[in-house]
UniProtKB/Swiss-Prot annotation:
Gene name tied to this protein: nnrE
Phylogenetic lineage: Bacteria, Thermotogati, Deinococcota, Deinococci, Trueperales
Keywords carried by this UniProt record: Isomerase, Metal-binding, NAD, NADP, Nucleotide-binding, Potassium
Matches recorded under HAMAP family: NADHX_epimerase
Catalytic activity, reaction form: (6R)-NADHX = (6S)-NADHX; (6R)-NADPHX = (6S)-NADPHX
Name assigned to this protein: NAD(P)H-hydrate epimerase
Organism of derivation: Truepera radiovictrix (strain DSM 17093 / CIP 108686 / LMG 22925 / RQ-24)
Amino acid sequence: MSAAQARHLTTLATGRYGFELQTLMERAGESLAGLAAHLAPDGPVLVVAGRGHNGGVGLAAAHCLARARRAVWVVPTHEAENYSGVPKELLERLAELPNVRLRSSLPKMKFSCALDAAVGMRLEGPPRGRTLDVITVLNNLGCKVLSLDVPTGLAADSGEVPGDVVRASATLALALPKPGTPPGGVVGDLYLASFDLPEALFHDVGLEPFVAPSPWARIV
């Protein structure tokens, strides 16, 4: 599924099919949190979240992990005032949870797992600035890194790497894998979360759905 098809899928889901965007993000976040818990059953988790849909799912995953009594550190990629809509609401709710720490910079400590929800499919040119800093830190944490849809720095459609890129241990694709994310390399192990979208929705975008046998399935 290309980046354009993914955007079209979301537009139809929240329009013609009547899904709330928050519901979609929370479903995807549950899958992301569940896979993170599978890969790293205990210990603190770092969540790096951008201000778009990818970041919103990362923030929803942080909620799920916090409810499961995991210690969660959340580092937004932008200042709080730059977040809007569902991601903003999720960020504000996270600030109220006792086992969640919001940080403006990446903490120097040991994590069992880090969630890369910084950019997703909206990569434009080589990463720079804050995004480049995030990539550098994630690659040097020494823990498992789980990317959402695509590792930050990787072009979802082409698989090109125009600059630095997150070297993920695993990547969770939402709905369908993206063309530039075959298993291995910087993608790591590839998993798919289908989260119960109607088959007709995929057909409307010209795609065949894949229904995972559990909240996620590994693609080999």
